[in-house]
From Swiss-Prot:
Disulfide bonds: none annotated. This is Threonine--tRNA ligase. It comes from Staphylothermus marinus (strain ATCC 43588 / DSM 3639 / JCM 9404 / F1). It catalyses: tRNA(Thr) + L-threonine + ATP = L-threonyl-tRNA(Thr) + AMP + diphosphate + H(+). GO terms for molecular function: ATP binding; threonine-tRNA ligase activity; tRNA binding; zinc ion binding. Keywords: Aminoacyl-tRNA synthetase, ATP-binding, Cytoplasm, Ligase, Metal-binding, Nucleotide-binding, Protein biosynthesis, RNA-binding, tRNA-binding, Zinc. Binds 1 zinc ion per subunit. It is an enzyme of class 6 (ligase). Homodimer. Its main location: cytoplasm. Its cofactor is Zn(2+). The gene is thrS. GO terms for cellular component: cytoplasm.
Length: 614
C-alpha cells in the first residue's frame, strides 16, 4: 500500500464519471465532499495487501494525525501512486477495511471518497513541514502468517448451566478439558515428543510428496483404500441425518474479483493459497463453501424445500506454516467432507444443529474416543441465546470451553470445534459445526416463503467426522494409545487395506488358498494371497507389519479338513474355523460400513515393493 498524506486547509471533491465498469455506488453522502482542516490520505492499494498491511497503515495515519491535529480524516482512492495495483474489487474491500479500522481507533471523523470514479478535486494545503508525507506500507519478514487479533472472553460452561472463570474452575474430574483450556486460554501446550502416528501414516502409504509444495501428501494403494472408504462413509453419514442432501462437485479455484469470494477470503484472514492466471487473481478453496454457495445462488428454492443439505468431499487448500505441517493432520492440501444445510431461520438451524451434534458425538464414540469442545460464540448469541447454548452443552454431557468474541466480525454466531486429546496430550481439532447468518446474504442465496417474499437462509456448516485425513489421524492416534498401554495396535476392519491375507505353507496348497480367497472376495471383502517364495515365519511377520486383521494359514491339515487356521490381530488368538465363519465375523465387524475393492494385485508375487514398505 502506498499513501500520500496532505494536511489541507480546505479540500473539495466531486465524482464526475465512471472509471470502472462496476464502480462503488454513489450516494448523497459520498458523491461530493467539502472539508476543512482535513488530513487527506491519497491511497493506492497494491497486490498482496492484507489486514496486517491495513493495521500498519492505520498506525501510520494516526501517527501523522496526532502530530498535525486535523478535525477530519478523508481516505481518497488514488491509483497513481503505484504500478502494482490490486484488483478493483480487492482494493475496494481493503479501502473499506481501512475506513472501518480507522473509525475504531480514533475519535476523529473518518470519511472515504467513492471508489471507481473519475473525480475533480480542489486542494488548499497548509504548507507546514508535515503537511505532505509519502509512505509505503509493507509487511517485512516473508512468509509471516497474518492472524486476526480478537478480544476474547473465556468461560467454562457446565451441562447444568453454570458459568465459571477458567482460572477458578476445578478440573480434577475433567483432565481433557484442562489440556484444552491450558492451550486456548493460557497459551500453554505440552512439548510433545515422538508421535507414533507419523510412523503409522507412513506404514499405510501416507507420505509427503517431495516434488510438490511442502504439506502435500501422496497416497499409496494402501492409503487409497482407507481414503476411499472414509469418503464413502462420510457420504453415508450425511444421508442418515433425516434431511434431503444433494451431492455435488465443482472447481477448486475462485476469482478474487468476485465480491463475495473476496469478502469470504478476507474473513478467513490468512493461510490462503493464491495464484495468478491471465492477470487475474484466484484463491484455491479452503473448504467446499465457495463452490456450494456459488451453485446455490443460482437455484430456485422454496420454503417447502427447506431444510436441505449440499455435500462434497472437497479438495481443499490452506497455506499452513511450514513448521506446523504434520502428516494426516496439518496439511496444505487435504480432503474435506463438507456439508452445508440451508434453514429457514435461526430457530430451524438450532434444531437441525442438534441432530448434527448428536451425529458428531455418535461417530467419535464408535471408535472408542470422546471429544472435548470449544464453543466459539458471538457476544450477542451468548447473551440472547444462553438457554440454547446450555442445551447444546447438556447434550455434550461434559463441560465445554466457551470463547466469546465481538459480534459482527465473522459470518457465524456459533462455531463449535471438537478436539480429541491425542497420544501426546495435545488438543487436536477434528469435527466442527457452525451456524452461519452471513453467507446467505453475501452470496445472494435466497428462498421464497409462503407469501412469495425472498429471504436469505441460515446455513449450517459441518464436517461431521472432520477432514478425511484428520479422521485418519484420529484412527491412528487411537492405535497409538493402544500401543502406549502395551496392547497390540490395530485399525477397524472396515478400514484395513487388506482384511484377510491367505498364506499357503507350500505351493501345493495354492489351489485351496485360491478357493478360500474367491469365497471371501465374493462376499465383498479385501483378500490377498502371499504366494512368494519366502519362509512361513517371514510371511506371517510381514502380514503383522501391515496390521492385517485376519491371517489365514493353510497347510495339509486345513486342506484335508476343509477348514482354515486364522490368526486374529485384535485378540492375538488363533482359531480353526470354516471359511463361512470368518465371513460372518467380517460381516459383523464391517456392518453399516462401506465395502471398497482392493487397489492392488491379489498375489503378492506380482507386486513391487512400495517406498513405505521398503
Amino acid at each position: 500500500m502506498r499513501i500520500l498524506t496532505i494536511h489541507a486547509r480546505k479540500f473539495h471533491y466531486k465524482a464526475l464519471s465512471q472509471a470502472l465498469d462496476k464502480p462503488e455506488e454513489l450516494t448523497n453522502e459520498n458523491k461530493e465532499g467539502f472539508f476543512e482542516n482535513v488530513l487527506v490520505v491519497f491511497t493506492s492499494v497494491e497486490e498482496g495487501d492484507n489486514e496486517k498491511v491495513v493495521e500498519k497503515a492505520v498506525t501510520e495515519i494516526l501517527d501523522i494525525a496526532n502530530r498535525v491535529k486535523p478535525k477530519t480524516i478523508l481516505l481518497y482512492p488514488y491509483a497513481h501512486l503505484s504500478s502494482d495495483l490490486a484488483s478493483p474489487s480487492q482494493a475496494l474491500e481493503i479501502m473499506k477495511l481501512l475506513e472501518q479500522k480507522l473509525r475504531g481507533k480514533t475519535d476523529l471523523e473518518v470519511y472515504r471518497a467513492p471508489f471507481g470514479w473519475y473525480k475533480e478535486f480542489m486542494l488548499d494545503c497548509y504548507g507546514h513541514p508535515l503537511s505532505e508525507l509519502s509512505k509505503t506500507i509493507r509487511i517485512t519478514g516473508g512468509g509471516e502468517v497474518v492472524r486476526r487479533e480478537l478480544k476474547k472472553e473465556f468461560y467454562i460452561l457446565t451441562p447444568d448451566g453454570k458459568v465459571y472463570d477458567p482460572e477458578k474452575f476445578n478440573y480434577d474430574k475433567y483432565p481433557d478439558l484442562k489440556i484444552l483450556v491450558d492451550k486456548e486460554v493460557f497459551g500453554k501446550e505440552l512439548p510433545g515428543g515422538v508421535n507414533r502416528v507419523n510412523d503409522y501414516c507412513r506404514k499405510f502409504g501416507f507420505e509427503w510428496e517431495p516434488m510438490s509444495d511442502h504439506g502435500h501428501m501422496r497416497y499409496g494403494p494402501h492409503a487409497v483404500i482407507i481414503m476411499e472408504s472414509i469418503m464413502q462413509y462420510s457420504w453415508n453419514i450425511v444421508r442418515s441425518l433425516g434431511i434431503p442432501v444433494y451431492k455435488v462437485m465443482g472447481t477448486n479455484m475462485f476469482n478474487l474479483s468476485e465480491k463475495p469470494v473476496l469478502e469470504h477470503a478476507l474473513l478467513f484472514g490468512d493461510r490462503l493459497y493464491e495464484l495468478k492466471v491471465d492477470n487475474e487473481k484466484f484463491v484455491l478453496r479452503y473448504a467446499a463453501c465457495h463452490q456450494q454457495f456459488a451453485m446455490l445462488r443460482d437455484w430456485i428454492i422454496s420454503y417447502k424445500n427447506l431444510p436441505f443439505g449440499m455435500f462434497e468431499v472437497a479438495d481443499s487448500y490452506r497455506l499452513e506454516q511450514r513448521g506446523e505441517l504434520n502428516l494426516c493432520f496439518r496439511l496444505r492440501k487435504f480432503y474435506m467432507p463438507d456439508l452445508h444445510i440451508l434453514n429457514r431461520d435461526l430457530n430451524e438451524a438450532i434444531k437441525i444443529s442438534r441432530i448434527v451434534q448428536d451425529k458428531i458425538l455418535e461417530e467419535i464414540a464408535k471408535i472408542g474416543r470422546k471429544y472435548v469442545a470449544l464453543y466459539n460464540v458471538t457476544s450477542d448469541f451468548f447473551d440472547k441465546y444462553r438457554d440454547i447454548l446450555i442445551e447444546f452443552v447438556r447434550r455434550e454431557n461434559y463441560p465445554v470451553l466457551v470463547s466469546v468474541i465481538p459480534s459482527g466480525i465473522y459470518y457465524w454466531v456459533l462455531n463449535v470445534e471438537y478436539h480429541i486429546i491425542d497420544n501426546l496430550n495435545r488438543p487436536r481439532e477434528i469435527a466442527t459445526f457452525q451456524i452461519d447468518i452471513g453467507n446467505g446474504e453475501r452470496f445472494n442465496i435466497t428462498y421464497t416463503d409462503e407469501k412469495g417474499e425472498k429471504h436469505h437462509p441460515v446455513i449450517i456448516h459441518t464436517a461431521i467426522i472432520g477432514g478425511i485425513e484428520r479422521f485418519i489421524y484420529t484412527i491412528f492416534d487411537t492405535a497409538a494409545l493402544m500401543e502406549k498401554e502395551g496392547k497390540t495396535p490395530y485399525i477397524p476392519t472396515w478400514l484395513a487395506p487388506v482384511q484377510v491375507r491367505i498364506i499357503p505353507i507350500k505351493n501345493e496348497y495354492l489351489d485351496y488358498a485360491e478357493k478360500v480367497a474367491e469365497k471371501i472376495e465374493n462376499a465383498g471383502f479385501r483378500v490377498d494371497i502371499d504366494d512368494r517364495g519366502e519362509s512361513l515365519g517371514k510371511k506371517i511377520r510381514d502380514a503383522g507389519r501391515e496390521w492385517i486383521p485376519y491371517i489365514v494359514v493353510i497347510g495339509e491339515r486345513e486342506v484335508r479338513s476343509n477348514t482354515i487356521n486364522v490368526r486374529i490381530r485384535r485378540t492375538n488368538d488363533q482359531k480353526v474355523m470354516v471359511t463361512d465363519e470368518l465371513i460372518r465375523i467380517l460381516e459383523e465387524e464391517t456392518k453399516n460400513y462401506p465395502r471398497v475393492s482392493l487397489t492392488m494385485p491379489k498375489y503378492l508375487s506380482k507386486r513391487p515393493i512400495p517406498s513405505y514398505h521398503a
